[in-house]
């Protein structure tokens, strides 16, 4: 019987816990925080991207519920943590970087990523970007330079570019 899960051939027929444990041994030194305060658009895509680029963990700030269909099963292999209150957004041992096209942000293509520090990339809501409470936890900000007429990328796309 064929394994119908959306996993690479290497992981076909492995148990879910075994896949997650194997990935945990290979993860990179960054995590992702995505806001789920108002809408859950693109959360599934962000989780899939976190899996593709081996993020250490994914923090979902706000509501616990989101449409898991968008993850195509990737949420099963990730270290997901739901943070419901602003007080939980404390990461003293990490370097927190907001991803948004705001005035003080630095261009991602020339940005010098912190060396030897655990980085948390913070992504806001699809329609409003980073809220003031999320901006308050960030040490600095980066943006993705664009050349067309639209002002922003969707969060799923921006997270893939940033994690890559």
What are these model-derived regions, one by one?
Residues 1-164:
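Post-transcriptional modification and biogenesis factors for structured RNAs
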